[in-house]
Amino acid sequence: MNARKILTVVALFSAAIAADAHASQRRFTYTQESGVIARGQVELEPQTTLLTGKEDYYTSLEQRIEFEIGLTSRLQTAFYLNMHATTEMADSSLGTDAGFDGISNEWKLKLRDPVADPFGLGLYLELSAASNEVEVESKVIVDKRAGNWLTAFNATVEPEWEFIPKDGSNDVESNLELKYEFNLAGTYFVKPSTSVGIEVRNHNLHISSEDYQHSVLFAGPVVSYASEAWWATLTVMPQIAKLKGSEVDAGHSLVTSELTKLEVRMIFGVDL
C-alpha cells in the first residue's frame, strides 16, 4: 500500500472516530441522521415544539422527554413521554387544554457511515400509543458528511389509527390518517461546535373517512451548538406553500385547518 492510500485510510478512520464521538448530537430537529449513540451510552433529550398561527387564535406547546440508549455500535433505542398544552379559540372565547399524549418507543439501525462510506444509510421505526390512538412511524435515512458540509434526506410513512367510541354502544369506530413526509436538510459547520443550515419539509396527510387531504411545504433555518457535556439545536419552520388542499382550505394560500403557519422546535441533549 503506497503512502497516499495509507494517508487516505488514516484520514477516513480519524473522521469516522470524530463523527462517532459526536453521534449523539442532532444537527437538525425535523430531519434524522443515520448516526447512533455508542453502546452503553444513555442520553436525555427534552424536545419542545411551538405551533402557532391558524385562522383563529391557536398556540400549542408539544413536549417530548426522550431517554436514548445505545445498544450496539449500529443500533439504538429510545423511550418518549409525550405531553401538550394548547390554547385556542372555541365558541368565541379562549380555552386551554393540557394533557398526557402517551408513550413512544424508537429504534434506529445504522447501515452505512456518512463519513467512511460514500453515503450514510439508516432505518428508523417509532411506535406510539395513547388512550385512543396508535401510530407507526417508519423512515429511510440518507446522509453525507463532506468536509464542513452535512446533508440529510428522510422519506417517512406514518399511519395513525384513532379509535372513537360510538354513542350508546360498546362498539368502537376506527379512523385512519396516513401521513407521509419528505425532508431535505443541509448545514455548514462554521466551527467544530457550531453549525448553521436549513431544513425543508414536505408534509402530506390523507384522512380516508373524511376524504381530506393536503400537501404543504415548510422551510426554515436551523442552528446547532455542542459542548463536551451538552448540545442544543433550534429550527424555525414556517409554512411557505400549499401544494394541495381540500375544500376547507380553498381560497387560502396556506393550510390552516389541520396545520399552523409556524413551527419552532428546540432539542436539548445531555449524557446521563
Q: Residue locations for each model-derived region?
A:
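Transmembrane beta-barrel domains of Gram-negative outer membranes and organellar outer membranes
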Residues: 22-272
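Cleavable N-terminal export/targeting peptides
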Residues: 1-26
